[in-house]
């Protein structure tokens, strides 16, 4: 922690509050939406609309970072989500709630891209993966703590979590605005400063593989974990909702425990072997879901998935940080869109397959798609300069 620049420490602390606040409202979103007397599909739109806007605004957010700098974009983005959450808390009908949550998606995209840009620009390559691990770990801790607080607030009112989320976001924004003062985070006055275009980034093989890996991770891991996996446990394995919540917490704790180690190994051994390790572990975890006929096997699969996710959640972003140059907000936004896009596509396809066939068919198809990651992991070039140079000399 002491090795990190102050601006990176600031982003990590601020993002912890963002993640905790989001965790506070996660349990209440579907129930609060349902309280307006709408269908389950309509409830789904409240959740999906936020993700869709995040997806389509990724490049726009990146352009804003290039023009105005990370500090201002982060603060305005957090402020937008805070205001939209406050408005959602006082929504009088479903359509108002949908509109306010949709508007919040743009703000979420803005502060996410700004956060990544701060990390990529502020740390050296030999510290990048560890920094990303700490950043992801902060999000995990916040996401674990949030739902417990949200559950207590829901006993007071379904609107209460949104009020609290709004306040927590203001705290996050104030921290960022007060401490993000590094000169390299301000908008440049040099019109000739090197700006990496998306076309330039796509010409790099490692960037293309990082992009594809992030998309597949969103599709096959993050998406189903938020959609069909809980339903599989309750409807197929006859587990309880409490069991789902408990196991998800255990999986997140395991992921958090391995995050720092994964980052250290990535900075020492290189991105390529860590991507391979993560891809293989995650593949086996997903295969375990297909054969899980008891809750004990589900628990084991989620623990293994937590380990694999620790390696996979940091490596692609570290690879992107290795290859970008100059003011690269649009490239970072484009990369963020990959994961968001996968999280939109994954639940739709896996949910459809579960409806027309069964959960195991959905898991099998998802595993088949994810297998592409194994091929990519063995084709990716090393992006950590020191490791790549040592291999060439050897």
Where does each model-flagged region fall?
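Paired small-residue
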Residues: 84, 95-103, 285, 296-304
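Juxtamembrane intracellular "pre-TM" segments in multi-pass secondary transporters
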Residues: 1-5, 181-211, 393-394
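Helix-to-loop junctions at the C-terminal end of transmembrane segments
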Residues: 58-69, 259-270, 354
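Cytoplasmic helix-loop-helix junction between adjacent transmembrane helices
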Residues: 100-139, 319, 323
């Amino acid at each position: 922690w002491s090795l990190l620049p102050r601006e990176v420490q600031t982003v990590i602390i601020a993002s912890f509050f963002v993640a905790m606040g989001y965790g506070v409202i996660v349990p209440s979103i579907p129930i609060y939406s349902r309280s307006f007397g709408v269908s389950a599909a309509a409830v789904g739109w409240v959740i999906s609309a936020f993700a869709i806007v995040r997806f389509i605004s990724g490049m726009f957010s990146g352009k804003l970072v290039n023009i105005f700098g990370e500090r201002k974009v982060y603060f305005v983005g957090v402020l937008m989500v805070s205001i939209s959450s406050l408005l959602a808390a006082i929504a009088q009908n479903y359509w108002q709630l949908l509109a306010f949550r949709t508007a919040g998606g743009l703000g979420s995209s803005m502060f996410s891209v700004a956060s990544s840009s701060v990390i990529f620009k502020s740390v050296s390559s030999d510290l990048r993966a560890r920094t990303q691990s700490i950043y992801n770990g902060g999000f995990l801790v916040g996401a674990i703590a949030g739902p417990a607080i949200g559950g207590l607030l829901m006993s007071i009112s379904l609107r209460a979590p949104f009020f609290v989320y709004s306040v927590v976001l203001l705290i996050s924004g104030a921290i960022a605005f007060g401490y993000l003062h590094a000169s390299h985070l301000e908008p440049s006055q040099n019109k000739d400063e090197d700006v990496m275009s998306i076309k330039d980034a796509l010409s790099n093989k490692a960037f293309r593989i990082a992009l594809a890996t992030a998309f597949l991770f969103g599709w096959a891991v993050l998406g189903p974990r938020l959609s069909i996996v809980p339903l599989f446990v309750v409807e197929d394995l006859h587990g309880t909702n409490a069991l789902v919540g408990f196991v998800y917490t255990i999986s997140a704790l395991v992921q958090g425990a391995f995050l720092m180690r994964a980052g250290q190994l990535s900075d020492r051994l290189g991105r390529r072997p860590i991507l391979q390790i993560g891809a293989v572990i995650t593949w086996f975890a997903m295969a375990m879901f297909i054969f899980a006929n008891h809750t004990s096997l589900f628990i084991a699969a989620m623990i293994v998935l937590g380990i694999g996710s620790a390696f996979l959640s940091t490596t692609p972003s570290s690879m992107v940080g290795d290859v970008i140059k100059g003011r690269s907000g649009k490239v970072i936004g484009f990369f963020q869109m990959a994961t968001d896009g996968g999280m939109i596509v994954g639940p739709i396809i896996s949910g459809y397959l579960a409806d027309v066939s069964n959960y195991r068919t959905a898991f099998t198809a998802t595993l088949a798609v994810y297998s592409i990651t194994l091929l990519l992991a063995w084709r990716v070039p090393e992006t950590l300069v020191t490791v790549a140079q040592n291999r060439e000399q050897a």
